[in-house]
Design a protein with these regions (language model features):
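Loop/helix patches that line or flank the sugar-binding groove of alpha-linked glycan CAZymes
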Residues: 2-172
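C-terminal beta-strand-rich structural cap/linker in extracellular carbohydrate-active enzymes
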Residues: 186-198
Length: 198
């Protein structure tokens, strides 16, 4: 049953998402890092099955506390953040100031959660329903795109774009943008949804 599948991109073991992405992409600016976190979190939530999130994932919580010269993060700091079960409170605490610092991300994830919890198209209860209504488009190698459609009473087009370049849709004028992590898009409405792009 789909409700027995738990999807996650961050849990209490190993690095949290922010710290993992910072380790893999150390030269990313804050905006790029934030968009990566939003993309991974949105993918996690909108997949069929149960979505699991760790506290602070939506506002870029970090466990990397620099103890080196001038507050630099040392290898020991990285190892402690990766396996923090016995680390001091300074590492495991939640910095609630990040909530307001990353309010746009919090609002974006809130909209994604609203889609997941109010639209059955993102939470089918049987594999038969998924097979009947969810269509994953074939991706081109190294495109950075995952595209799927959900066709039921409503038709949703979901595009996850990690390519770093805009993706052009044919017949885009016939689509309604429901939610996007592109800050230039105004997407305050999540009611009366017809299509969805990320």
């Amino acid at each position: 049953m789909p409700n027995q599948v738990v999807n996650y991109v961050e849990a209490h073991d190993n690095y949290n998402l922010h710290d993992l992405l910072e380790e893999f992409h150390p030269h990313d600016d804050l905006e790029t890092l934030t968009k990566r976190i939003e993309l991974a979190t949105a993918m996690n939530i909108l997949m069929q099955g149960l979505a699991f999130m760790e506290l602070g994932q939506e506002f870029s919580r970090t466990k990397l506390v620099g103890t080196g010269p001038n507050g630099q993060v040392t290898q020991a700091d990285k190892e402690r953040a990766m396996n923090s079960y016995n680390a001091p409170d300074q590492v495991n605490q939640v910095d609630w100031n990040l909530l307001s610092k990353h309010q746009d991300s919090v609002n974006f994830i809130r909209k994604i959660i609203q889609l997941k919890t109010t639209r059955k198209e993102f939470s089918y209860s049987t594999y038969e329903e998924i097979y009947q209504h969810v269509y994953v488009r074939q991706a081109q190698t190294n495109s950075g795109l995952i595209i799927f459609e959900v066709k039921d009473k409503k038709h949703y087009l979901v595009i996850f774009n990690a390519s770093g370049t805009p993706y052009r849709l044919e017949n885009a004028d016939k689509l309604k943008l429901v939610v996007s992590n592109n800050r230039s898009k105004i997407n305050t409405e999540v009611e009366n949804l017809d299509e969805l792009t990320l």
